[in-house]
Amino acid sequence: MNEYLFAPRDVFEHSTLIPSALKKDFLRAADKLIAAVIAQWHGNADILRLHGDCHAGNILWRDGPMFVDLDDARNGPAIQDLWMLLNGDKAEQRMQLETIIEAYEEFSPFNSDEIALIEPLRAMRFVYYLAWLIRRWDDPAFPRNFPWLTGEDYWRS
């Protein structure tokens, strides 16, 4: 929780990228999100080693799958890696998740209680990613590739 919620919250508080006129409201919204994630989090998850950024863009195919971009590898619930493979609308994601879990269970039992963690994990990823962008802003590639981050419209939304 610290790495994905509390440390990013501190980054937001000290960031000069968030327009000062919007910072108070943004921090209030971040605090509400953090409280909601904490309220929904439960300790029923089985913790194991994860890729941490497991989406289709980090799987290369040549003679079989090869996972790349392991800098986010960490411990957490299996669903953390599985939900990131989902795409499409809710119905498509539900079917995809059923298929992924069925395949997962060919190798290891899946704790279905973890499904309730998808939305909290999604929120945590969003908060963490935004703080990561802010931390990296001094890299010349970031303002060039993420120009929307300095726009007031982004922070207002």
Predicted feature residues:
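Activation of the activation-loop gatekeeper triad in protein kinase-fold domains
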Residues: 69-74
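An alpha-helical support segment within catalytic cores of ATP-dependent transferases
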Residues: 4-52, 62
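Conserved ATP-binding subdomain of kinase catalytic cores across diverse folds
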Residues: 1-3, 113
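ATP/Mg2+ or Mg2+-diphosphate-binding catalytic cores
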Residues: 16-17, 21, 131-157
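All-alpha amphipathic helical-bundle segments outside canonical DNA-binding/catalytic cores
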Residues: 112-122
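Active-site activation/catalytic loop segments of kinase-like enzymes and analogous catalytic loops
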Residues: 78-109, 125-141
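Activation loop entry of protein kinases
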Residues: 50, 66-68, 80
